[in-house]
């Protein structure tokens, strides 16, 4: 397909004094409409920074790490902080802290930083160390992330941390199920967390510690390996995955594929993997994951590719687009003067434009990286702080032109809202809401969310509490209108009728076993807290 018309603009060149080496997952949009990110280094302290920048490239340094040694506040933040539902930013540093093995921090929009946790406080670093990727705030309000090293088996961990700083290691990798997770996690529509490990898994592949994995883990710490990479289907997935509008997960591998230069894959939440694209010398070694933009296509970056004479030996890197069918088009090739090695991936701002960073390159010979924007002609939209939740759950909406807003709707159901500023409003999931787009009616027109909000169903009770095959059971809950299936015990499909948003009747099917009652909707699966007893 023909590439869309695009315009790349270098907004800022880092020069050391304002930071250098912006690295993984470099930018996030704040409630003020500005973009926030980190640099892993800065002149004088080499501790790195947290910064904010306008869409035009006016940069403000909010925090300098390691103002004096030892660096108990952290050093080398590799990933951007995320915007918490409380309006603060939460992130990690790769090094520093009490034990110099990394930290989790909270920062106000004004730049006041609090260290929430220092890693390697437990014997043999059983709590993990060297967090490398971005955090995710789940629907339970806690933050989840990974450490590249440490844990009970020394191969990295998955952790949970409360907003106040209480950390729990919920899983330690052991090589056979994965090793050295580099990026963070996502919470998918089923409520589970998904991620990748850069090593482990298939130990017979060419990589010394395995070619890496894709995994699923519950918030309680039950891990399932979905796929072990073999090399030909990809190797070393250093970036995480994204859940697309079709419900599948998409991601990249740095190496492997038919050319051993990286690959793009699609994988279902049950673990069926489909190779989508194999990179070659024209664009290779993606270190960042993908985003699905408002046009339905996927956008990403490769760390290498382009003219090897400018950036020896493999080029300065590229920005690319992939259709849902797997057709890849290179949109921009970096030439060093406008940046090199876009390792951090892209963010689509609510103005429709893409924003990103390069780790190196830039004008003036500083080679400390750049901040850039890329327009492909997409229009404005709204984004949500959470895209999954139950009725009455609070949420934040980012966008522009909110002053004078006259309505907020969850897939057509009106919701209460408060306009906080021209770029931010708060709302709650209304009763009767169904999975679908969120829309905001502003004086300038209707803005639609870039992704559907998935309303989680709830099963509150059922009657009778027991019965034989053929018994009709009345199930009471919330958000049941879009029910796709009902199951008893081991979730053998049952015939059912949706009576209302709060009631479903189902017939106990042949083969049902004693256990919880579950209802699946496009928003996920609701499971009862009590068991239905199947009588003989």
Predicted regions and their residues:
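Conserved beta-strand segments that form the floor/walls of ligand-binding pockets within enzyme
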Residues: 474
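LysM (lysin motif) carbohydrate-binding repeats in extracellular/periplasmic proteins that recognize
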Residues: 482
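Extracellular beta-propeller repeat domains
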Residues: 1-469, 486-488, 500-512, 517-536
């Amino acid at each position: 397909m023909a590439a869309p018309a695009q315009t790349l603009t270098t907004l800022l060149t880092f020069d050391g004094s304002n930071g250098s080496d912006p690295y993984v997952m470099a930018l996030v949009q704040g409630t003020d409409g500005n973009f926030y990110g980190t640099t892993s280094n800065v002149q004088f302290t080499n501790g790195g920074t947290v910064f904010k920048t306008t869409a035009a490239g006016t940069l403000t340094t909010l925090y300098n790490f390691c103002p004096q040694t030892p660096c108990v506040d952290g050093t080398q933040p590799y990933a951007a902080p995320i915007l918490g539902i409380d309006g603060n930013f939460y992130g990690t540093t790769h090094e520093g802290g009490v034990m110099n093995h990394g930290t989790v921090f909270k920062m106000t929009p004004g730049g006041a930083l609090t260290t929430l946790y220092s890693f390697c406080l437990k014997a043999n670093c059983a709590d993990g160390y060297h967090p490398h990727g971005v955090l995710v705030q789940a629907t339970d309000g806690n933050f989840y992330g990974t450490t590249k090293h440490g844990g009970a088996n020394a191969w990295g961990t998955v952790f949970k941390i409360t907003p106040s700083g209480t950390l729990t290691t919920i899983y330690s990798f052991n090589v056979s199920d994965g090793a050295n997770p580099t990026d963070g996690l996502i919470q998918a529509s089923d409520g589970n967390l998904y991620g990748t490990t850069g090593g482990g898994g298939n130990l017979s592949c060419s990589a010394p510690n395995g070619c890496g994995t894709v995994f699923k883990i519950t918030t309680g710490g039950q891990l399932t390996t979905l796929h072990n990479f073999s090399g030909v289907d990809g190797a070393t997935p250093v970036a995480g995955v994204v859940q697309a509008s079709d419900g599948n997960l998409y991601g990249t591998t740095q190496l492997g594929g038919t050319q051993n230069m990286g690959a793009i894959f699609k994988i279902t939440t049950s673990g069926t993997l489909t190779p989508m694209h194999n990179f070659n010398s024209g664009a290779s070694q993606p270190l960042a994951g993908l985003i699905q933009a408002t046009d339905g296509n996927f956008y990403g970056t490769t760390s290498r590719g382009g003219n090897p004479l400018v950036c020896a030996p493999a080029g300065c890197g590229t920005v690319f687009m992939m259709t849902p069918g797997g057709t890849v088009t290179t949109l921009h090739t970096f030439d060093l003067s406008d940046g090199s090695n876009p390792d951090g991936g892209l963010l689509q701002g609510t103005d429709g434009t893409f924003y990103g960073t390069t780790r190196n390159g830039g004008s003036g010979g500083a080679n400390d990286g750049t901040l850039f924007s890329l327009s492909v002609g997409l229009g404005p939209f709204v984004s949500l702080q959470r895209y999954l939740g139950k009725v009455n759950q609070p949420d934040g909406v980012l966008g522009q032109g909110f002053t004078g807003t006259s309505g907020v709707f969850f897939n057509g159901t009106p919701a209460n809202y408060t306009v906080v500023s021209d770029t931010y409003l708060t709302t709650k999931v209304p009763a009767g809401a169904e999975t679908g787009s969120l829309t905001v009616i502003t004086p300038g027109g209707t803005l639609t969310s870039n992704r559907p909000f998935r309303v989680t169903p709830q099963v509150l009770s059922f009657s009778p509490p027991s019965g034989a095959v053929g018994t009709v059971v009345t199930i009471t809950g919330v958000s049941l209108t879009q029910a796709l299936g009902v199951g008893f015990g081991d979730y053998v499909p049952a015939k059912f009728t949706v009576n209302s948003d709060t009631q479903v009747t189902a017939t106990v099917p042949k083969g049902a076993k004693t256990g919880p009652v579950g209802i699946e909707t496009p928003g996920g699966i609701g499971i009862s807290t009590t068991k239905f007893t199947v009588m003989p």
